[in-house]
């Protein structure tokens, strides 16, 4: 680097014209000198500075990265397909859900089946000798009127109750079967 001296000259704030009516007070001319180190540049263009990497990469990796970054999108897609075939992997194997699962956890834990919490009570069949008792049971279990309860047990199978708990479904099934109807829980 070359070392040079820079000079700054301080002047008075008064106008320097000779036509001024006021007598100008002469200010002493002061000069400050201080050294400045300037870089020796061969040309005035900005130089390319590489960003500092968190990890030093080997030259081979840098060259490979430069070549990959110069690929077109079509060439990059072909490269991905080639590497998937060569390495025997798929894009699905890199899904975030696969990362969350611990290796070997699936083999240790048995498959968990979700227990059903809502059930439907279906009246499958009502014999003719049990119609009146079934209508009474339907009216007792619901707030249906006589006509609506009668229409419910005609044209079977029909859903009697939907989305009820297991206990409520079993209780309704028990009462309807005591009345003589054939009932199933779905």
Curated annotation (Swiss-Prot):
Bias (Polar residues) ranges: 1-11
BP term (GO), one: translation
UniProt-annotated location(s): Plastid, Chloroplast
Pfam families per UniProt: Ribosomal_L12, Ribosomal_L12_N
InterPro entries cross-referenced by the UniProt entry: Ribosomal_bL12, Ribosomal_bL12_C, Ribosomal_bL12_C/ClpS-like, Ribosomal_bL12_oligo, Ribosomal_bL12_oligo_N_sf
GO molecular function, one term: mRNA binding
Boundaries of the annotated transit peptide in chain numbering: 1-53
GO CC list: chloroplast; ribonucleoprotein complex; ribosome
UniProt cross-references to Gene3D superfamilies, sorted A to Z: 3.30.1390.10, Single helix bin
Keywords noted in UniProt: Chloroplast, Plastid, Ribonucleoprotein, Ribosomal protein, Transit peptide
Sequence ranges of Low complexity compositional bias: 12-24
Main location per the UniProt record: plastid
Region described as Disordered: 1-24
Transmembrane segments: none
NCBIfam families registered for this protein in UniProt: L12
Family designation: Belongs to the bacterial ribosomal protein bL12 family.
Listed name of the protein: Large ribosomal subunit protein bL12c
């Amino acid at each position: 680097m070359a070392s040079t001296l820079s000079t700054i000259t301080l002047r008075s704030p008064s106008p320097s014209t000779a036509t001024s009516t006021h007598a100008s007070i002469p200010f002493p001319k002061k000069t400050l000198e201080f050294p400045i180190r300037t870089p020796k540049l061969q040309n005035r263009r900005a130089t390319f500075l590489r960003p500092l990497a968190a990890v030093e990469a080997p030259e081979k990796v840098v060259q490979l990265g430069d070549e990959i970054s110069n690929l077109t999108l079509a060439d990059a897609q072909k490269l991905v397909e080639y590497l998937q075939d060569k390495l025997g992997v798929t894009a699905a194997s890199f899904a975030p859900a696969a990362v969350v699962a611990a290796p070997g956890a699936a083999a240790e834990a048995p498959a968990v089946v979700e227990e059903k919490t809502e059930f439907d009570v279906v009246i499958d069949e009502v014999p003719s000798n049990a119609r009146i008792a079934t209508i009474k049971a339907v009216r007792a279990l619901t707030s249906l009127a006589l006509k609506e309860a009668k229409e419910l047990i005609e044209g079977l199978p029909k859903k009697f109750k939907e989305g009820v708990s297991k206990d409520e479904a079993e209780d309704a099934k028990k009462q309807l079967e005591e009345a003589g109807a054939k009932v199933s829980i779905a």
